[in-house]
Amino acid sequence: MNIHEYQAKAIFADNSIPTLKGKVAFSVDEAVANAKELGGSVWAVKAQIHAGGRGLGGGVKIAKNLDEVKDYASKILGMNLVTHQTGPEGKLVQKLYIESGANIVKEYYLAILFNRMAEQITIIASSEGGMDIEKVAKESPEKIAKVGIDPQIGFKMFHGLEVAKVLGLDKDESKKLISMIAKLYKLYMDKDMNMLEINPLIKTAEGDFYALDAKCSFDDSALYRHPEIAELRDITEENPAEREAAEFGLSYVKLDGDVACMVNGAGLAMATMDIINYSGAKPANFLDVGGGASAETVAKAFEIILRDKNVKVIFINIFGGIVRCDRIANGILEATKNVEVNIPIVVRLDGTNAAEAKTILDNSNLKNIKAATNLKNGAELVKSLVG
């Protein structure tokens, strides 16, 4: 689960992690009033959406007087903000964060995340803050520190010193930053986060460090332990189809291709997407119907993927273990009763009750179904149908 910048900064402040003063605003008048209350002569007017790249998309502006606060707030609030993380459809800006200015002398990048390959928590830091970290990693890898932490040991001074060395900090600066990272690491672990990112982390003329931005992502499976975090959920920022799918126990993620996938099991789903890509087509979604799929959930999955107007072909790839292939077949028939299907469906069914499933589909009136003998054959059929 993701939260907004203003929510993340409130959590930071509650845990003694330095942030600049700021207030959330839901209207232009409230934005101006917040700037007045914060005081000073410079403010950042920031769009609040669950995506990065807001500045490049025009969603972050620096105002040097209250008239500019009003002008920028009126332009950003209600805009459809498109960034490299939102996709071409963008996100509607429904709230702003008005933040006090600071005398910035240097920007850094800092993140804490779970490294599944190494089975460790990893701190990633760079002297090149405020930029796309992937670009920095590609062009200047020597400017990035990657420090692994064994969760059984936790964050120690030597971890912090390794980060400070790459960032080029002096002794006093290192001491301040290491203290800040220690608090961030504790927060990350205590709140069951998947990722904590500050980009940029700034150093002021006074030599102090502040989180100028804050992005936190939490483990959905651990939210029952953190009701105060679960309350921060903003469902308006979530994809409606993904939210609806979750209500039916389906794991669905929309992508930008034209081949809809319906698969059981996350591993098989990823393999299916890989082979679709390898064949030259592009998957339109990740969809795992799970091991306990019923005809009802399969029908719902059909409804959801057919709402995507980019879809040209549906590829159903089921290996029947716990889930029975005949249930999938009945779900397909149930779905076609409620939703008109005018695009080809490639079906590969193997495993429990696969023969019964084939009989069900053969005896149906569906003329746009094509049977695949194996995964490779299915991908080839899909590619030929997409064109």
Curated annotation (Swiss-Prot):
Function: Succinyl-CoA synthetase functions in the citric acid cycle (TCA), coupling the hydrolysis of succinyl-CoA to the synthesis of either ATP or GTP and thus represents the only step of substrate-level phosphorylation in the TCA. The beta subunit provides nucleotide specificity of the enzyme and binds the substrate succinate, while the binding sites for coenzyme A and phosphate are found in the alpha subunit.
GO cellular component: cytosol; succinate-CoA ligase complex
Taxonomy, superkingdom: Bacteria
Lineage: Bacteria, Pseudomonadati, Campylobacterota, Epsilonproteobacteria, Campylobacterales
Native source species: Campylobacter jejuni subsp. jejuni serotype O:23/36 (strain 81-176)
Names of required cofactors: Mg(2+)
Annotated positions binding ATP: K46, G53, R54, G55, E99, A102, E107
An MF annotation (GO) of this entry: succinate-CoA ligase (GDP-forming) activity
Keywords recorded for this protein, A-Z: ATP-binding, Ligase, Magnesium, Metal-binding, Nucleotide-binding, Tricarboxylic acid cycle
Residues annotated for Mg(2+) binding in this entry: N199, D213
InterPro entries according to UniProt: ATP-grasp_succ-CoA_synth-type, ATP_grasp_subdomain_1, Succ-CoA_synthase_bsu_CS, SUCC_ACL_C, Succ_CoA_ligase-like_bsu, Succinyl-CoA_synth-like
EC number(s) given by UniProt: 6.2.1.5
This protein's name: Succinate--CoA ligase [ADP-forming] subunit beta
